[in-house]
């Protein structure tokens, strides 16, 4: 693994330099202090070229703007607290039987993992729907506690027929991404978060000034579930309110999350569908940031490279890197075969999580 890390770091430098101007090398530039020098140069060049021209950038959330996964950590955290249990789970989310034995009662985290083994298209929505029945105000308190939690979260799961004890890391904001997001916004480049996690959970972090991202709540696109006003019985969802001009983040805190999904659903091709629906049908992002092959890459391969746009990749594993290389090759070939300008393999800035934390 050490040799792999070194090779990726070297490749990160090489790919960043391709898009970077010639400047003296130091760790970061200006406000991008928590970035490798070549990456900072490439990003600053792109920002300077695209500043104050009504451009926008898109970011995945988990393992992209913070380290680790906010849903995968909140599930065992809330289960351990007794906030989310089998008893509170919406009946519609009982998709398969729990795998209990005389000596082991399966956790919801384990249940989620077994759904993922069937298909990511099952467990992605399930993880966002699992908050059903919680009031937003209460969930916000739990998420704030989780973000401040100093240790790891104990849980367990089935690996085949063996029970494995696991310690889950809470989400940890990347300082580098906080710098980048704020720098983009300071230069008139709109930032959108497009996440496969629950939209309200992501909004609770990126739109709360204390976490430093300073993303407008209206600019968060995630897996949205219907919310209910328990007094009137009315159903709503933040995205509908935003479209209708009635969105009020504070007033929404008293709404209760449901399990029924709103669409587009922001995973895989749905991420790009959300951009087309809520951001712009024709304009392309000048930066797309992500870490998951096949899901985030629908955004990556639509970056406006003609404007010097950047494909930003946070490389968390060897397997993801290998998968990304295959996708870059396939998309470049697809562009070539269709007589389009080949951009899929251009302007990649690659960093490791440790580079920007």
Report each predicted region and the residues it spans.
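A metal-dependent, Asp-based hydrolase signature
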Residues: 70-79, 84-168
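Non-catalytic pre-domain segments flanking phosphatase-related domains
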Residues: 3-11, 17-61, 69-97
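Short, solvent-exposed linear motifs at loop/edge-of-secondary-structure regions
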Residues: 60, 68, 133-135, 145, ...
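A generic alpha-helix surface/boundary motif
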Residues: 69, 121-122, 200, 269
């Amino acid at each position: 693994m050490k040799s792999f890390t070194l090779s990726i770091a070297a490749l990160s430098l090489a790919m960043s330099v391709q898009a970077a101007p010639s400047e003296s090398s130091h760790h970061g530039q200006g406000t991008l202090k928590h970035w490798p020098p070549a990456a900072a140069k490439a990003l600053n060049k792109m920002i300077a070229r695209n500043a104050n021209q009504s451009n926008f950038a898109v970011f995945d959330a988990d393992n992209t703007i913070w380290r680790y996964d906010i849903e995968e950590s909140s599930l065992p955290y809330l289960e351990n607290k007794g906030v989310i249990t089998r008893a509170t789970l919406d009946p519609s989310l009982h998709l398969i039987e729990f795998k209990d034995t005389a000596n082991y009662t399966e956790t919801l985290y384990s249940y989620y993992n077994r759904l993922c083994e069937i298909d990511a298209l099952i467990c992605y929505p399930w993880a966002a729907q699992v908050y059903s029945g919680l009031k937003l105000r209460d969930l916000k308190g739990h998420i704030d506690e989780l973000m401040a939690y100093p240790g790891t979260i104990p849980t367990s799961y089935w690996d085949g027929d063996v029970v494995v004890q696991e310690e889950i890391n809470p989400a940890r904001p990347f300082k580098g991404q906080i710098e980048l997001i704020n720098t983009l916004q300071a230069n008139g480049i709109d930032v959108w978060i497009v996440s496969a996690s629950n939209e309200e959970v992501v909004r609770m972090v990126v739109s709360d000034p204390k976490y430093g991202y300073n993303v407008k709540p209206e600019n968060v696109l995630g897996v949205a579930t219907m919310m209910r006003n328990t007094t009137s019985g009315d159903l709503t969802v933040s995205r509908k309110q935003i479209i209708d001009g009635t969105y009020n983040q504070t007033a929404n805190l008293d709404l209760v999350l449901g399990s029924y999904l709103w669409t587009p659903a922001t995973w895989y091709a749905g991420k790009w569908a959300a951009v087309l629906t809520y951001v712009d049908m024709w304009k392309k992002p000048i930066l797309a940031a992500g870490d998951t092959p096949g899901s985030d890459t629908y955004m990556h391969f639509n970056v406006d490279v003609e404007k010097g746009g950047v494909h930003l990749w946070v490389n968390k594993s060897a397997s993801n890197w290998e998968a990304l290389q295959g996708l870059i090759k396939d998309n470049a070939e697809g562009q070539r075969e269709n007589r389009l300008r080949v951009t899929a393999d251009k302007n990649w800035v690659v960093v490791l999580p440790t580079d920007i934390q």
